[in-house]
Design a protein with these regions (language model features):
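Alpha-helical transmembrane segments of integral membrane proteins
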Residues: 6, 25-33, 142-153, 168, ...
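Membrane-interface helix-boundary motifs at transmembrane edges
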Residues: 17-25, 134-142, 188-195
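Hydrophobic/aromatic-rich transmembrane helices and adjacent perimembrane loops
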Residues: 2, 6-7, 154, 162-186
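Transmembrane alpha-helix segments characteristic
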Residues: 35, 119-130, 134-159, 175
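Hydrophobic, aromatic-rich transmembrane alpha-helices
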Residues: 16, 95-140
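Perimembrane helix-loop-helix junctions
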Residues: 7-35, 178, 184-186
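Membrane-lumen/periplasm interface segments of specific transmembrane helices
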Residues: 27-108
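Membrane-interface catalytic loops of GT-C/OST-like multi-pass glycosylation enzymes that act
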Residues: 46-49, 114, 138-143, 158-172, ...
Length: 198
């Protein structure tokens, strides 16, 4: 799912360490493994639809006979987004978030509402926590912040695009756990202790 795209941010830290340490062989191995891992996904997309990342038509590399027409692929992309927002009419695709968010939220189950609110609060808390690291108000744990930021960015991306719970429930549940868990760990173990793991 495209809602998992931000997980690629987790590769930033190891990449910086490898390149900074001039470990070119290891860098090549990991890049190769990444390509080998992603290749079946892309091949499958092309064989089924003619598009590298269906239904997104911004990357148009192949001209094959079975290619789904661009207009139909664009329609599918919009239909997926409005469906996630609780609508069935594709003409409502351009509605601003301020118009559809409250209606979407009302349709959620009680526990899902609670977790969405907790996830939103965790994003706000992470902004304050991250600013505190940047300005040196508390200990800098950049690796932890990268993990927290990746999860929070994935939640925000899911929420702003196509927030059907089954597409992004992992980000809804993980955001409060990872953000608040990391902050709690930093408070309980400001020096030493569990911080060695980060």
């Amino acid at each position: 799912k495209l809602s998992a795209a931000f997980i690629l941010l987790l590769t930033v830290y190891p990449a910086v360490c490898l390149v900074g340490g001039r470990k070119w062989k290891e860098t090549g191995v990991y890049l190769g493994l990444g390509v080998v891992t992603a290749l079946p996904f892309f091949i499958r997309n092309v064989l089924i639809s003619g598009w590298l990342v269906y239904p997104f038509t911004q990357i148009d590399l192949f001209d094959v006979a079975w290619k789904i027409p661009k207009g139909m692929a664009d329609y599918d992309a919009r239909e997926i987004q409005v469906w996630g927002r609780g609508y069935t009419d594709v003409l409502q695709y351009d509605l601003p978030m301020s118009r559809w968010l409250s209606g979407w939220f009302q349709t959620l189950a009680g526990s899902d509402k609670l977790f969405v609110v907790l996830a939103a609060v965790s994003v706000a808390a992470l902004l304050v926590y991250g600013a505190g690291m940047v300005f040196g108000w508390w200990e800098r744990r950049w690796t932890l912040l990268l993990v927290q930021g990746t999860v929070a960015a994935s939640f925000v991306f899911w929420l702003c695009t196509s927030p059907l719970m089954r597409y992004g429930c992992v980000w809804v549940y993980l955001s409060p756990a990872v953000v608040f868990g990391g902050i709690l760990e930093a408070v309980l173990y400001p020096a030493g202790g569990l911080q060695a793991a980060w």
